[in-house]
Amino acid sequence: VHWTAEEKQLITCLWGKVDVATIGGESLAGMFVMYPWTQRLFSEFGNLSSPTAICGNPKVKAHGKKVLTAFGDAIRNLDNIKDTFAKLSELHCDKLHVDPENFKLLGKVLLIVLAGHYGKDFTPACHAAYQKLVNVVAHALARRYH
């Protein structure tokens, strides 16, 4: 994947403002609320019975932070995202059996959450760069499935 200097700057500039715990928790919770079938692999998280329960669930928040921390690894390694996510792709495919479509769904929710938190900074150009990034990350995570 080729990244322009502008894309790299837009991605890293916004990422410097991101509260990983908050954005990660809200993104994972949002995916569980908007796409409830994605909850099936998270029964150990306890109560996911309603949007209120999901959004207040400490395990959802903690895992969301973990997921977004890994997303930050992609940003630090924009020119080597496939290798950055090789082990995570293997884990999600071989051990966890996650539907690779879920990576795209989480990416969609992440974009919505970023737009909600960073409105004026989440310009159309920034949105386009982050859309490209979530697509590349989803593809890298799904790589083991192919």
Swiss-Prot record:
Function: Involved in oxygen transport from the lung to the various peripheral tissues.
The name this protein goes by in its record: Hemoglobin subunit beta-2
UniProt keyword annotations, A-Z: Heme, Iron, Metal-binding, Oxygen transport, Transport
UniProt xrefs under SUPFAM superfamilies: Globin-like
GO biological process: hydrogen peroxide catabolic process
Membership in a protein family: Belongs to the globin family.
Gene Ontology annotations for the cellular component aspect, listed alphabetically: blood microparticle; haptoglobin-hemoglobin complex; hemoglobin complex
PROSITE patterns named among the record's database cross-references: GLOBIN (PS01033)
Residues involved in heme b binding: H63, H92
One GO MF term attached to the UniProt entry: metal ion binding
Gene name linked to the record: HBB2
Reported tissue expression: Red blood cells.
Subunit structure: Heterotetramer of two alpha chains and two beta chains.
Domain Globin: 2-146
Pfam families assigned to the protein according to its UniProt record, in alphabetical order: Globin
